[in-house]
Amino acid sequence: RQQPFVPRL
């Protein structure tokens, strides 16, 4: 499944 693009700061 595709994961949402969430850049971790």
Curated annotation (Swiss-Prot):
Record protein name field: Locustamyotropin-3
Keyword Secreted included in the entry's annotation: yes
Keyword Transit peptide: no
Cellular component aspect of the GO annotation: extracellular region
Family: Belongs to the pyrokinin family.
Principal location class: secreted
Alphabetized InterPro entries for the sequence: Pyrokinin_CS (IPR001484)
Location of this chain's protein in the cell: Secreted
Residues with the Leucine amide modification: 9
GO process annotations (BP): neuropeptide signaling pathway
Role: Potent mediator of visceral muscle contractile activity (myotropic activity).
Gene Ontology molecular function terms on file: neuropeptide hormone activity
Keywords of this entry: Amidation, Neuropeptide, Secreted
